[in-house]
Amino acid sequence: MDASSTPGAIWVVLTVILAAIPIWVCHMVNTLWLRPKRLERHLRAQGLHGDPYKLSLDNSKQTYMLKLQQEAQSKSIGLSKDDAAPRIFSLAHQTVHKYGKNSFAWEGTAPKVIITDPEQIKEVFNKIQDFPKPKLNPIAKYISIGLVQYEGDKWAKHRKIINPAFHLEKLKGMLPAFSHSCHEMISKWKGLLSSDGTCEVDVWPFLQNLTCDVISRTAFGSSYAEGAKIFELLKRQGYALMTARYARIPLWWLLPSTTKRRMKEIERGIRDSLEGIIRKREKALKSGKSTDDDLLGILLQSNHIENKGDENSKSAGMTTQEVMEECKLFYLAGQETTAALLAWTMVLLGKHPEWQARARQEVLQVFGNQNPNFEGLGRLKIVTMILYEVLRLYPPGIYLTRALRKDLKLGNLLLPAGVQVSVPILLIHHDEGIWGNDAKEFNPERFAEGIAKATKGQVCYFPFGWGPRICVGQNFALLEAKIVLSLLLQNFSFELSPTYAHVPTTVLTLQPKHGAPIILHKL
């Protein structure tokens, strides 16, 4: 370039920059002030109430809410009437308490409309195209994306391929794996018993290991040992994420850090191990040697059929990367959900021995001292009532959020694009207007005639979601919980330890913050 042309080029660059500055400023003013205030006016015109929007360039409000939540969780509460919502769901609880059920709260620059009306909830769950999930947090790629995060045609394709893995006939073949893993845990507990046949055990870590072992066996079968290594890496990834989640620096995930580097290394290890297992299985499948008696085998077989049915379409089946994401999701969803369900069940049955006795009597009537079988599990009415009630009081997830990408009518509301709707599962499950004056108490009797009768036909009970996107693994989780609970009731009676501190908290699921110490008595 000629030296004389250099000043001209510099002036061109400076002119472009100077012209871009006012455009950028206008964009930021609109994003940070004009648009939020416009959305707020629209919501107030609909009769919704909430705090006024305030411009905040830091995370002071989120930090304040987190502080309130941490202070609340620093003290234990009683189990007789457990109103856990103020402790673990501070923003929604305070908003509803202050403004009523027709209200909204702010999450950054986006207003979040709190939906508690069963008819509106039904509409949100059913119209999955109109109410998609919000955009992924950048950290999600380090844990799992998979089915729960996909939308539209991609979600429909993955759901179709995954569904066969969770058909009841397939799950029936996995019952021996459930029983085997549970018997191993029971043997460990029996080894801890004193001479009088009792011991105190924090059952929470044992139940986490149990459900991890079950997923390893049922997801990978013959590749169980390799699967267990992958799940150990996923556990380490989860711990790394927990140390990073409190980083409040804006755009933190765009900056280099030790935590981010460690998570990338773990992700590479997970990917390499999973890819090795999948490649071997795919090779065996093509040669006709593969079995489909575990989740991965069924998934690959279903994917193979999908690809074979439309060989000319690149989008027919799942890629290897997508199969890996679904395998990670099997672990995260299957392990955490069932472990938490079993922990809360033992806590509540330890507190309510009359229900424990009724459940044990039923289990012994149906199975005696034999291993639970598929046919008998369907006859466990009391056990099912107990599990439903535990899931009502302690659902795995405490809320669901959906985003509006276009103006929509929801019931009598006209909601503009840019708004989010939040379904506060925990608040609805504990609502005295729906469940009666004992809504915060443990009373499985409310489910004596099933869910439809208990809810009066309303959409107000959804521990696994509802509608087309209801959790594909709910039958897996409930079958596993029934088998484990049946085996425990056959072998032990148990009570809540005096050292137990009741502090529900959310990590990936709603779980006991300080564990679940239980006193076991051998039967």
UniProtKB/Swiss-Prot annotation:
Its EC number is 1.14.14.115. Heme binds at residue 471. InterPro entries: Cyt_P450 (IPR001128), Cyt_P450_CS (IPR017972), Cyt_P450_E_grp-I (IPR002401), Cyt_P450_sf (IPR036396), Cytochrome_P450_Monooxygen (IPR050665). It comes from the Eukaryota. Expressed in roots, stolons and stems. Not detected in leaves. The chain crosses the membrane at residues 9-29. Pfam families: p450. CDD domains: CYP72. Its cofactor is heme. It is an enzyme of class 1 (oxidoreductase). It is found in: Membrane. One of its GO terms (biological process) is glycyrrhetinate biosynthetic process. Keywords: Heme, Iron, Membrane, Metal-binding, Monooxygenase, Oxidoreductase, Transmembrane, Transmembrane helix. Saccharomyces cerevisiae expressing Glycyrrhiza uralensis CYP88D6 and CYP72A154, combined with the expression of Arabidopsis thaliana beta-amyrin synthase (beta-AS) and NADPH-cytochrome P450 reductase, accumulates glycyrrhetinic acid (GA) and, to lower levels, beta-amyrin; these GA production was increased in the presence of G.uralensis cytochrome b5 (GuCYB5). It catalyses: 11-oxo-beta-amyrin + 3 reduced [NADPH--hemoprotein reductase] + 3 O2 = glycyrrhetinate + 3 oxidized [NADPH--hemoprotein reductase] + 4 H2O + 4 H(+); 11-oxo-beta-amyrin + reduced [NADPH--hemoprotein reductase] + O2 = 30-hydroxy-11-oxo-beta-amyrin + oxidized [NADPH--hemoprotein reductase] + H2O + H(+); 30-hydroxy-11-oxo-beta-amyrin + reduced [NADPH--hemoprotein reductase] + O2 = glycyrrhetaldehyde + oxidized [NADPH--hemoprotein reductase] + 2 H2O + H(+); glycyrrhetaldehyde + reduced [NADPH--hemoprotein reductase] + O2 = glycyrrhetinate + oxidized [NADPH--hemoprotein reductase] + H2O + 2 H(+). It is a single-pass membrane protein. GO terms for molecular function: 11-oxo-beta-amyrin 30-oxidase activity; heme binding; iron ion binding; oxidoreductase activity, acting on paired donors, with incorporation or reduction of molecular oxygen, NAD(P)H as one donor, and incorporation of one atom of oxygen. One of its GO terms (cellular component) is membrane. Belongs to the cytochrome P450 family. Involved in the biosynthesis of Glycyrrhetinic acid (GA), a natural product which exhibits anti-inflammatory activity. Involved in the biosynthesis of the triterpenoid saponin glycyrrhizin. This is 11-oxo-beta-amyrin 30-oxidase. It comes from Glycyrrhiza uralensis. The lineage of its organism: Eukaryota, Viridiplantae, Streptophyta, Embryophyta, Tracheophyta. The gene is CYP72A154.
